[in-house]
């Protein structure tokens, strides 16, 4: 199923879309630029899930999930608490390991480089970048907090969105 929520934050309208089922959240996306970009990202999530043999129900149904994601973004709910609501369907063991580590170790308002995450998990920065790029749970799994050593805003459909999320959390470059 798909649920939507619209929120105002820092003078911008943020639309959050959640793909979910009875096991929990299957995917999250958001837009600061209206419905067209949001629909592109929903299609990306659905294609990603289907490519991993995860069944998706495309009917629209209200849920509390968009509000939960917004509460994580604004700091009223912790990433760790919200992580329990994720279905984790179709993820590899490596992705689960990376996402779990990130949720537990990189807190609101903090950033970390791909290299430092890689060192902590004994893998390569490129592997971490790939996991961040495939992250179906942005905001709850805070891939926006992982930055490049030289180019801060890698592996994101819109670098301005990553910067916006960090600004909401109080991070300043």
UniProtKB/Swiss-Prot annotation:
Question: What is any one GO biological process for this UniProt entry?
Answer: DNA repair
Where is it located? Cytoplasm
Q: Which UniProt keywords apply?
A: Cytoplasm, DNA damage, DNA repair, Methyltransferase, Transferase
Show the active-site residues.
143
Which reactions are catalysed by this chain? a 6-O-methyl-2'-deoxyguanosine in DNA + L-cysteinyl-[protein] = S-methyl-L-cysteinyl-[protein] + a 2'-deoxyguanosine in DNA; a 4-O-methyl-thymidine in DNA + L-cysteinyl-[protein] = a thymidine in DNA + S-methyl-L-cysteinyl-[protein]
The record's GO CC annotations read: cytoplasm
Presence of the UniProt keyword DNA damage in the record? yes
Going by the entry's taxonomy, the superkingdom of the source organism is recorded as: Archaea
Q: Any other noteworthy remark?
A: This enzyme catalyzes only one turnover and therefore is not strictly catalytic. According to one definition, an enzyme is a biocatalyst that acts repeatedly and over many reaction cycles.
Q: What is this protein called?
A: Methylated-DNA--protein-cysteine methyltransferase
């Amino acid at each position: 199923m798909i649920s939507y929520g619209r929120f105002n934050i820092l003078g911008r309208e943020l639309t959050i879309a959640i793909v979910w089922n009875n096991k929990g959240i299957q995917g999250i996306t958001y837009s600061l630029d209206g419905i067209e970009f949001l629909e592109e990202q929903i299609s990306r999530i659905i294609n990603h899930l289907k490519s991993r043999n995860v069944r998706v129900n495309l009917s629209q149904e209200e849920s509390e999930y968009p509000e939960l994601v917004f509460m994580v973004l604004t700091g009223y709910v912790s990433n760790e608490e919200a992580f329990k609501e994720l279905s984790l369907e179709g993820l590899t063991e490596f992705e689960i390991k990376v996402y779990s580590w990130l949720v537990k170790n990189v807190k609101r308002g903090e950033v970390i480089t791909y290299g430092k995450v890689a060192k902590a998990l004994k893998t390569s920065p490129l592997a971490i970048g790939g996991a961040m790029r495939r992250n179906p749970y942005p905001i709850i799994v805070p891939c926006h907090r992982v930055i490049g050593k030289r180019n801060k805003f890698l592996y994101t459909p819109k670098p301005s969105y990553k910067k916006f999320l960090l600004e909401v959390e109080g991070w300043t470059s």
